[in-house]
Design a protein with these regions (language model features):
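Alpha-helical transmembrane segments and, especially, the helix-loop junctions at the ends
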Residues: 42-58, 64, 69-114, 118, ...
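Membrane-embedded alpha-helical segments and adjacent helix-loop junctions characteristic
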Residues: 1-65
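Short, amphipathic, aromatic/basic-enriched membrane-interface segments that mark the entry/exit
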Residues: 22-30, 83, 161-166
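Long, contiguous bundles of hydrophobic transmembrane helices that form the permeation core
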Residues: 112-187
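Structural signal for the C-terminal ends of transmembrane alpha-helices
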Residues: 8-11, 71, 132-133, 183-184
Length: 187
C-alpha cells in the first residue's frame, strides 16, 4: 500500500481526486469542519479495514491531499489520520474476536452490544476535540494557508502537472478501498 500511495501522488492522482471534490468543498468555509467530517468518515472506515498500517496509508493517499488542499494544516491532517485506529473495533478486529471468544458470545453480538455504543460516544467527543484542539494549535503555531504552496505542504511534487492529470485518475486512489469493502463480509 505504501508504494501504491507514493505512486498515486507521483502521477497526480491525489490532485485529480481533490479537483473532483474541489467545488463542493468550496462551500465549507471552515477547514476544521471538514477535519471533523473527515474524522467521522475515517472512523466508519475503521470498522471495515482492521489493518492499522493499511488504513493509515490509504488515508494518506486519499484524505490527506484533500484536507491539506482545503486549508487544513499538514500537522492537523496527520493528527486526525494518526488517530484513525484509536480503538480496535469491528467484527474483523483480532481483539474483538478474542474478547468475544473469551466472553463466550458471537463476535457480531459483542460488536453491536458492547463495542458500538462506546465507539459512537467516543467518536462524537473526539470529533469536537480534534476540531477545537487542532484549530487552537494551528493558531498558536501561526499556521496560514497558502494555496500557491500546496505541494510544499503535501511534501511531494507530482511528476505530472497537477492541472494536466486527467480527472479519471481520481478513481485510482480509492480503488483499494472499494476492493477491501467489496471483498469483505459487508458486501
Amino acid at each position: 500500500i505504501g508504494g501504491f500511495s507514493r505512486y498515486m501522488e507521483h502521477v497526480g492522482a491525489s490532485s485529480a481526486l481533490f479537483r473532483v471534490f474541489e467545488k463542493p468543498l468550496k462551500h465549507i468555509h471552515n477547514p476544521y469542519l471538514l477535519l471533523g467530517a473527515a474524522f467521522i468518515v475515517e472512523q466508519i472506515m475503521v470498522i471495515f479495514v482492521p489493518s492499522h498500517a493499511g488504513l493509515g496509508l490509504l488515508l494518506m493517499c486519499t484524505l490527506y491531499p484533500i484536507l491539506v488542499r482545503s486549508g487544513v494544516s499538514p500537522l492537523s491532517a496527520l493528527g486526525v489520520i494518526g488517530c484513525c485506529q484509536f480503538l480496535d473495533v469491528g467484527p474483523g478486529s483480532g481483539n474483538a474476536n478474542m474478547a468475544a471468544q473469551v466472553a463466550g458470545m458471537d463476535v457480531s453480538e459483542y460488536f453491536v452490544y458492547y463495542q458500538l455504543p462506546l465507539f459512537i460516544a467516543l467518536v462524537v467527543i473526539l470529533t469536537f476535540v480534534h476540531m477545537f484542539v487542532q484549530a487552537w494549535w494551528d493558531k498558536r503555531e501561526g499556521w496560514k494557508f497558502d494555496p500557491k504552496n500546496v505541494q510544499t505542504f503535501a511534501g511531494t511534487k507530482p511528476a505530472v502537472d497537477v492541472k494536466e492529470a486527467p480527472k479519471i485518475y481520481a478513481i485510482l486512489p480509492v480503488i483499494p478501498l472499494f476492493l477491501i469493502i467489496f471483498f469483505s463480509k459487508v458486501a
